[in-house]
Amino acid sequence: MEWLEITVRTPPEGVELVADIFQEIGTGGVVIEDPAVIFKYAGATCPEEWAVPESATADGLPRVKGYLPADGTQSKRLEELAAVLARLLPGPASAVSTRTVSEEDWANAWKKYYKPVRAGRRLVVKPSWEDYRAEEGDLVIEMDPGMAFGSGTHATTCLCLRLLEKYVRPGGTVYDVGTGSGVLAVAAARLGAGRVVAVDIDPLACRVAAGNAERNGVAGKVQVVQGNLLEKVEGRADLVVANIIADVIAAFAPEAAGALAPGGVLIASGIIEEKAGLVVCALEAAGLAVCERDEEGRWVALAARLKA
């Protein structure tokens, strides 16, 4: 299968807007290449091992990439994108380029950017094909996300991992909603959870998550379930983690609260700063009291405990 890769070069303040526009027109994935982020991680984690293509940092401007299936509808949706960009980011504020890529190229090209990242005090996420010199006390999670969401390096995932370090109870039950690659489910199991249910509506993500659980030696703890949110999950959990988007989290809050045991905690991430208030209100209305807020850039993660 072939895909149309659309690249928008934009100033930093336009990145989130362009990513939102891509989602609105129905792209099958969004990639953000931000030189500031690239250099930040390259300087923080084994800089000698990083190989950054010059094209990713040449002019210092972020690039946002979206993918549309080459199924005959891409031209119309590309026109929609151009019209919205012209209205919201006029003139030289954005520049658009396109190219056709095969699914095999898309599935493997990202690997050159994926390097080990310390995501918390103890948790380190590394790709299965990379070496990492573990420090004393490190919990190294080996991942191969394939085409599933969740390499472990995005701010929303790192925020979740930091909160998991604090809230996973030894022997407890954890539900990972929208598991993607399974990185959060695997982390919960490695942190001592006794039972983890990893849920995703995408069968590909379920296969990838199961493979990563096996790769990390926690397949006996992690049950992968294909389904929408918690509709196929029974029983209560000590912890529910959902790294999705703000509007879905807000709508999901009552269901999450109903799935928590007394004193249980919901970790919610994937929330842009502007929508954090919306999510907090939804959590409070569902009987959840926010007990911690963590931020990275414009991303927010919340930990909320079920009220007595």
Curated annotation (Swiss-Prot):
<dbReference type="InterPro" id="IPR004498">
    <property type="entry name" value="Ribosomal_PrmA_MeTrfase"/>
</dbReference>
<feature type="binding site">
    <location>
        <position position="157"/>
    </location>
    <ligand>
        <name>S-adenosyl-L-methionine</name>
    </ligand>
</feature>
<feature type="binding site">
    <location>
        <position position="178"/>
    </location>
    <ligand>
        <name>S-adenosyl-L-methionine</name>
    </ligand>
</feature>
<dbReference type="GO" id="GO:0032259">
    <property type="term" value="P:methylation"/>
</dbReference>
<feature type="binding site">
    <location>
        <position position="243"/>
    </location>
    <ligand>
        <name>S-adenosyl-L-methionine</name>
    </ligand>
</feature>
<dbReference type="Pfam" id="PF06325">
    <property type="entry name" value="PrmA"/>
</dbReference>
<dbReference type="GO" id="GO:0016279">
    <property type="term" value="F:protein-lysine N-methyltransferase activity"/>
</dbReference>
<keyword id="KW-0808">Transferase</keyword>
<dbReference type="InterPro" id="IPR029063">
    <property type="entry name" value="SAM-dependent_MTases_sf"/>
</dbReference>
<dbReference type="InterPro" id="IPR050078">
    <property type="entry name" value="Ribosomal_L11_MeTrfase_PrmA"/>
</dbReference>
<dbReference type="GO" id="GO:0005737">
    <property type="term" value="C:cytoplasm"/>
</dbReference>
<comment type="similarity">
    <text>Belongs to the methyltransferase superfamily. PrmA family.</text>
</comment>
<comment type="function">
    <text>Methylates ribosomal protein L11.</text>
</comment>
<keyword id="KW-0949">S-adenosyl-L-methionine</keyword>
<protein>
    <recommendedName>
        <fullName>Ribosomal protein L11 methyltransferase</fullName>
        <ecNumber>2.1.1.-</ecNumber>
    </recommendedName>
</protein>
<keyword id="KW-0489">Methyltransferase</keyword>
<keyword id="KW-0963">Cytoplasm</keyword>
<feature type="binding site">
    <location>
        <position position="200"/>
    </location>
    <ligand>
        <name>S-adenosyl-L-methionine</name>
    </ligand>
</feature>
